[in-house]
Amino acid sequence: MSEIWEDAIKSNAWPFVEAKKILDSLNGQIPEKGYVLFETGYGPSGLPHIGTFGENARMVMVQKAFEQLSDIPTKLICFSDDMDGLRKVPSNIPNPEMVAQYMDMPLTSIPDTFGECESYGHYMNAKLRSFLDKFGFEYEFYSSTNCYKAGMFDAMLIMVLEKYDEIMELMLPTFREERKATYSPFMPICPKTGKVLQVPIEKWDAKAGTVTYKDKAGNYIEVPVTGGHCKLQWKPDFGMRWAALKVDYEMYGKDHLANARLYSEICRILGGKPPVQLCYELFLDENGKKISKSKGNSISIDDWLKYAPVESMALFMYQNPTRAKRLFFDVIPKNVDEYITFNQKYHLEEDRAKRFANPVYHIHHGNVPKIETFGITYSLLLNLTSVCNPSDKSVLWGFISKYEPKATPNTNPYLDHLAEFAIRYYNDFIKAHKLYLSPSEKHKVILQDILDMLSDIADQTEAEAIQKAIYDIGMKAGYENLRDYFKDLYQILLGQNEGPRFGTFIKLYGVQEMKKLVEGQL
């Protein structure tokens, strides 16, 4: 075994931990189908949200980690449950009244409310695929509608009929009495209306491959379970799909956890082997509620990318997948700055094992670009934007160029993008909420001390020396907690509760400019 393999197999980075579980489940052998299958799922009832991207990004991290550990070929499929009946109309789509007329219809049988594709389901699928394509995910797209209608699942559906009683014995104890009386794993597609029916099944015939139900008029209707004439309920569907496609690895949100045992048991009943599974925690909105495609109560993919590079979004997905995290606009600056820190550490690190533990290794699948920001962070640019209120990024570059003459927009495109992002973020989230603290007499003494200090130092004074001088002024002012001191300065000078390290900020903004800012508050 190579040293690289040794470092990878010993790594505690979660993608490697998951990859080792897959390798162990295979006993190091190539599956009969010739590859290891990774599957992600998508419910196209509403527009894809950032959690959809997150599942695919995380899945690829595990896939690439597995490829470090083994030369067994891999494949990733993204499976869309687009044959599901519409149960709820999303609030964030055009013409919701039109869509409401198609309740219980398969998503691929509803007209496209956006007017671009052959159906509502096709539009939602296209939105997901365009994003996955844009960011270089290598995957095969599977449509539930196509799989059912093309007969890909026919053999398994016949087996569900053959194992009907066994599956019902598994499922019925999980329901209330009222639901037990009507439940069946099969949902016929109504020959007249095209709706996905949740009706009691009066008769099932494995040899004929049919089920029989009563329509509203009391007539017995017999339909094949094959060829797209029936769809399985979502819990049996999950397990059937694992067995039919021979899935080796799947991850799903915590909302699936209670049913994961059922998925696995149904897979076994149908002769399959359940995949290795990872349950990740759900994202929460600003109020601590689960984010939802139908509500649109979170950041969209496009929203994040309006204010920050995609790498910062990937870092958010990488961090602690089994811990619930609040996902709203205020998490963006922190993730950008953490990405910058991890990137710099990666390129300074010579120990390969430590590189494997660095999130950027998994974000970039081992091919980590080197970025240079000269110590300028996103947060620092936001604060610079806050004091100079620029109309465009050229104003920020005026300060950046003085701070670091070697930096230019052409030679440092990452920093150039950050400047543009910072202005957008400031205008949309900070500017309207600035609230300045009117300085007290005590504050004015402090501000005068800062002004005197700035008048005494040279322009080339190092940031740490300036930071220490600011710190010493706070100590002299008699604050019990220096956090309160810095908070007062941020509120007086920036109109914010939080802010930068003043030493670095003053170096970037300029001593003379800082003097003007302080004088303006005296």
UniProtKB/Swiss-Prot annotation:
One GO BP: lysyl-tRNA aminoacylation
Recorded catalytic activity of this chain's protein: tRNA(Lys) + L-lysine + ATP = L-lysyl-tRNA(Lys) + AMP + diphosphate
Coiled coil, from the record: none
Keywords: Aminoacyl-tRNA synthetase, ATP-binding, Cytoplasm, Ligase, Nucleotide-binding, Protein biosynthesis
EC identifiers of the protein: 6.1.1.6
Amino acids binding ATP: 293
Domain of life where this protein originates: Bacteria
Pfam families given in the database record: tRNA-synt_1f
EC category: ligase
Similarity comment text for this entry: Belongs to the class-I aminoacyl-tRNA synthetase family.
PANTHER family membership: LYSINE--TRNA LIGASE (PTHR37940:SF1)
Name of protein: Lysine--tRNA ligase
